[in-house]
Amino acid sequence: MNEYNNDNMEQEKEKKKEEQKYKNIIKKEYFIFPRLYDKNKEIEYNKLRIHNIKEYICIHLTISLFIILIECFVFSFNLNIKDTTYVEICVVIFSILNCLMHIVVLIKMYFFTSESVYTKGVFIGYIVLNQVFQFLSLYFFTKRNEQSKNDIAHLKYYDNSFNLYVHFFVDSVFILCLPALSFFLSVLFMMMFLCLNILLINMIKFNKTNYGSDIYHICLLSVVLLMFLILRYMMEERNRLLFFFIKDMMFDNYKKWYSDYIGAHYDKDKDSTTINGDNNKYEKEKCEDYKFLFSNKCILFHDFTLNACYKDYYSMICFLNKLLKSCNIKEDMSSNTSVNINGDTYQNMNFHDNINSNIPKNYNSFYEELKKNLNESDILTIAYEVEVLKNIKKINCDEIGKNWDYSFIDSEYGKSTLVILEVGYHLISPYIENNENKKKKLQLFLLLINSMYFPNPYHNANHGATVCHLSKCLAHITDYDSYLNNTYMICYLIASIAHDVGHPGKTNSYLSETNHILSIRYNDMSILENYHCSITFSILQLIGFDFLINNEDTKLVEKNNYTNMRKFIIELIISTDMKLHFEYVDIFKKRKKSQNFDISDTDAINLGTINIKLADIGHTCLKWKDHAKWTMLVSEEFFSQKRVEELHKNKNIDPLNFSNFGKEDNIDEGMIFNYENIYINYINNINNINTYDYSYIKLNFIHHHDFVKSIPSTQVYFFEIIVMPLIKELQSMEKSKKEITQKVLHNLNINLQTWRLIEKNINLFYNTEKMTGTDYYKNLEKQKLLRGIRLLDIAEEDVISLTKNFKEEIKHGKL
């Protein structure tokens, strides 16, 4: 018996240790009304929320001050100097004190920092004093009127009832919207405010019996405002946890839910509650080895990620559930499968029979058992094996990664929804050692990268694959691939294919100007480039980075470690920040002139950055048809950003207001890295939903002639100042075939000449199928001013002849 008790005590101790270990997010006493476990993080969270409504607070104070000034004027309007009573003096004094308090608080809010003013005490003090002053002013003013039997004839639209309703509404909305107050405190203030106003009505109308309608109306207004409070509370990102409880209560058996969730896991003696992703319940963790997906990013409060604390864990559960279900229902699942459970291998577990069984109970028990013994990588691997392998197209094209002039944007590979996976595997797999597990990890990595490229007009998966293709071409042209071992070639190609992963379709300057959450996280320094690196290494951390290392390498083996490879990849991705363009070009120029310039060692990273930089803007050096299409796409993306910027200016949207984050015409929340978004894009890819094919993209900028007119001059400037010097630095690195001179630089010169021609005659730009719906095109067609040749069909000889004809027309005064 003693041994049994000792065992129980040891188990209890272990449980307490585990509870202490996994104690993190939600305090049990705030299970329905979530609070961060760490008090300091809760304070930071509230500061940021209040900071976001700074303007709202100032607007409220201004409106309230305006109302009180009107009241003060009314109170002093009937002030009779000859027979002034103490009541009249009190009315004016209380009104003036209220005005002064509003002015002081308004100045404090507007001019002082959040740390010194955005405290709960300030707001509670303001609310209490405002109500005291207001109560006394109205009471004494009404009492004075009753005593003198003098209605306010001079201001007939002003009466006591109207004043009550205005104050009640304005001050109640302020209380209900103020995030510094907790839910219960807001409700408490609201109820106290209601009682105070009912008392005031009774005191004001003490000699009248028919004031029930006023009480009824003010109570009805209170109900509406309380509904608004609940709605505001539920709409706050971190409080959406309650939605998931309601969902579980509605769709699951209530008694089972109550006994499992409340009876078993909502014990008063427990300090905190955590989320168990394995069994989709909110309970204590039992598995010591269990780990959350990116717990340091998604679960814990980190870098002011407002939507991460109380939302992503459930998104993660949904993602894992959907993946498992989508995997298990496949008919092609092997009927003879082994599953490792608690270290033991069980053979002949028939997935098909269990999943397609007509008895849901059997399926659920097997499903739960399966989930308990699979970690995140296993689940993703199962999904990958079941879904993706059947959809991968093996690339049988020797031109990808070798021929600079290959028309990738129009190829069948460029239009594939799995373009990153297919092209990346085609280019990287030759450098992977002959190991099936490593090749599988490579495919899984590319799948997740593919799923985090979003359907922007320009910065999409097609762009990522194109840059990888061009980077491989440049590695061959500059003989870079002969200096690197297989491990670093893998890193080089991974950096190129993931260099824009997660791109939201907005520039760094936009993120910085709008104080976007990413600009705060990365301190306005290479914001997106740092974000791309973060996503890349987060995925590598999940699935393991061992597939990067080729153990068959015979050179630079001592440098084949994760730290060096990580530094190499980060440097390559950061170099694509155009703000750092001249800095990287100058570094390469100086190193190239140095006597100890050595690509095989210290300068490998310098040449790599120049290669990937040129590949990133490499569409400028493609054939005109491909380059013109990419220009259309990048112009559309810039135009979309311009529209959003104008929207912010027109609406006077506070750049510090993060509440606009995730709305239409802003950066979509779905473009922030989490596993729910990976799953959504994953399903779109599996279902072959391609939203970034050039032929399907709608171009909105074509209807704005001023924007269209600016494109040629912008391109000419970009070619001359940015691209041309970059290519000339690489010319000295090309091999005997002179491909940079004969292909890259040649294409650039032709494209530059074409843009100069279009700059002088913008009508050429409109002669394309995409432009046929514009008013400008119709006008040109009506006046017969369109040239015979289409924009995308312009060839080298056409540029020469058109330039010659254009000069002759200018000479003869026809233009």
From Swiss-Prot:
Residues 78-86, 142-160, 205-210 are extracellular. CDD domains: HDc. Residues 384-762 form the PDEase domain. GO terms for biological process: cAMP-mediated signaling; cGMP catabolic process; cyclic nucleotide metabolic process; gamete generation. A divalent metal cation 2 binds at residue 500. One of its GO terms (molecular function) is 3',5'-cyclic-AMP phosphodiesterase activity. Its EC number is 3.1.4.35. Residues 1-56, 108-120, 182-183, 232-815 are cytoplasmic. Binds 2 divalent metal cations per subunit. Site 1 may preferentially bind zinc ions, while site 2 has a preference for magnesium and/or manganese ions. Pathway: Purine metabolism; 3',5'-cyclic GMP degradation; GMP from 3',5'-cyclic GMP: step 1/1. Glycans are attached at residue 207. GO terms for cellular component: membrane. InterPro entries: HD/PDEase_dom, PDEase, PDEase_catalytic_dom, PDEase_catalytic_dom_sf, PDEase_CS. This is cGMP-specific 3',5'-cyclic phosphodiesterase delta. It comes from Plasmodium falciparum (isolate 3D7). The lineage of its organism: Eukaryota, Sar, Alveolata, Apicomplexa, Aconoidasida.
